[in-house]
Amino acid sequence: MRAGSGPTVPSGSGGRGGLFGGLRNRLGTGFRLAGRSLGVLREHPRLAVFPVVAAVGVVAFLAVVLGGVTLANGAESPAVAVASLAVLLAGPTFVTVLCNAALVHATRDAFEGRDPAIGRSFRAALSHWPQILAWALVSVVVGALLRSLEESSGLAGDVVAAVLSMGWAALTYFVVPVVVFEDAPARSMIQESGRLFRDTWGETMGAEVGVGVVAFLLVLPGIAVAGIGFFLASTPDGSLLALLVGALVAIPGLLVGVTLGDIAKVALYRFARDDEAPAEFADLDVLD
């Protein structure tokens, strides 16, 4: 991985061969980033604990508040119902982002040769809880607006919502590392994330594709089990059982895929911010 101030334009990018050659290079880099991220996870399997904690935490949170929301549905005060719904929507997002922040912190520890301790990483993430809460609320609001646009405007709304969703995902790709490593306030974390994405857009997109393909391959056995079992089942109960077994087979792969994505994200953040890569990624020529 070569230091530099930002992405360079591949030679001959003005022609068709240069354009597609550049895309191939970016995608190739993305697959190599995914492979190196898998190597980091093999060396530090504890990193995969954080997505598990997130999943368990979301389920536990929903179980706790579901009764309150049920009561709120019959409440006379609309404010109580709205507040309960807001908690139901924002709470799982907060739990997920908190665990994601802890994983990001643990990944940096692993890159720097320290043991990625679970407790220390969660304490570090909790020290940024105001920004994490703000980001969770923003995510919920933006997500609701995009869904509303998609559902209310037909095909045109679907297209616009999809484009805006991709743009939002790109703009906010580095929000969690910016919060964890820079303690950025809510008003600037999205702006700084967008700047970092601009500097590494090709590598980031390549990494997302590479990690996405790896994650798909990891969950493919579960999809196959669910699909084959569903079509071979002779009863509704058998079909449901096949789907449940397939989900159980796919979940570990899904959690590993989430972990790989965050490992690659921290590596890209380090490169964009410090112009140097973690040792595990140092020989990748990212900007070619």
Question: Language-model features: where?
Answer:
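Hydrophobic alpha-helical membrane segments
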Residues: 1-288
